[in-house]
Amino acid sequence: MSRSVQMFSILLAVLPGIAATAQAGGPKPPAGFRAIFNGKDLTGWYGLNPHSSANLKGEKKHANLKQQRADFPKHWKIDNDELVNDGTGPYATTEAEFGDIELRLEYKTVPKADSGIYLRGTPQVQIWDWHQKFDPKNPNRKPHLGSGGLFNNTPGSPGRDPAVLADKPFGEWNQFRIRQIGARTWVWLNAKLVVDGAVMENYWERSKPLPANGPIMLQTHGGEIRWRNLFVHEIGADEAKTILNAAETEAKAKLSKALTLHASFDKGLDADFSRGDKKCYVQQGQALVHAKPNEEVKFAADAGRFGGALHFPKKGTYRPSFKDGGVLGYNAKSWSASVSAWLRLNPDQDLEPGYCDPIQIIGNDNKKGYIFLEWSKDETPRYFRYAIRPLFPIWNPNNLQWADIPNDKKPMVQVARAPFSREKWTHVVFTVENINDKKNPPVGKLYLNGKLQGAIEKWDMTFGWDPAKVLLVLGASYVGHMDDLAVFDRPLTDIEVERIHELKNGIRELYSSSSGDR
């Protein structure tokens, strides 16, 4: 690992001292920071709920803003060096405006309240009562996942939900460390990274970038919340460039470490890199033999998203496969992985009748587990799906045909209008997480072009595969092009999926520049 990556890893892991208790003489900012709340009065702050004035104009808006300033001290007070809100009233808003910053603060709230931190006047780094239960009737509201996410980002986008639950119990102080450079935003809650460089969307005008500057705002929403030790470090252009470069290097290093297989299809069917066997195989009777291009699976030089590609010109039975050993890492205790590929086809014009599975993960018996991407056979346009089928009695206790099971009773994600075409490549990523795990909930996620499409959750995902028989299979009844296949040994995060989607030269960027083909 390079020195810059090591230094950035240390930087991410360390949360320099924010005072654990109120200190005599007021807040004491760490080196390079300044206090934006003096612990004594409301100097430097005013009241503003931007939502209440957003649609007003002229004198009505002027009167509203004036009234909010007047109402501010009615709902905010100073107590023991803490800035305290009663749960209502306008938001505490800094007179000063900020651009690229690192913000550190502490907060403590009560049950059934929520709040948030607006950056550049834009919502928000979310604060939840994380004890609230998930309501399936409001699926985009997920307080049970914890605080720190960019709640006003588009549902399913990177950073909207926190990566881990990091909240402390009620009655204890929580510590936020928030860094924002441009729209890229990192959030640490209680020293845990919950948002990793995600882009904060402009809630007010989503088609435009985040404003260059704006105030910091502390939201009021339904219950008392206390704030203390609010410190800001303003990040200059040179420092911002250094941080972004180090973050990019660190992100690629994490992905490189997780990579287990990469097949660029630039020279043929075999993988360029593998922790296990690079050879691509095909089933002949009971044997696996080395796969070679033929009339059913052609090598198409310069036809790929990055260089060459595989072309499946017609529905066939020749299915290139990669062995698991060291690649997928299937095991009977707790299995997680991610698979990435690019596809190009028009499903409604190119595919022949019947189901089509461009990628499968299979074992010794499909009734003991079966994972696949598929296009449906009867709908127009065809639905695109990602399915994880565990042991047969779990998902199909009534022994029905797959097509006869109601869609909401299938362990799958379905996309009615997926963005596939002959003219453009579509990036597909699917993850498996905690398969066979008896303690942690299993999850499977589907992403298209870097965006989350849905998740398979609340299923018993017990498999019964023989690990020695597990295969990654390509092109079952598939007609179209495929490029840049990759496997990772863990579920990628939303932001990591977005990153590999944006790689200019494909997965090879994760390893070739530093270590050569492995």
Specify the residue positions occupied by each region the protein language model found.
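Carbohydrate-interacting regions of secretory-pathway proteins
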Residues: 22-251, 257-261, 271-274, 286-288, ...
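Positively charged n-region of N-terminal signal peptides that target proteins for export
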Residues: 1-7
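Repetitive beta-architecture junctions, highlighting loop-to-beta-strand starts
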Residues: 441-444, 483
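Bacterial N-terminal signal peptides
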Residues: 8-19
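Low-complexity, Gly/Ser/Thr/Pro- and Asn/Asp-enriched, turn/coil-prone segments
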Residues: 279-287
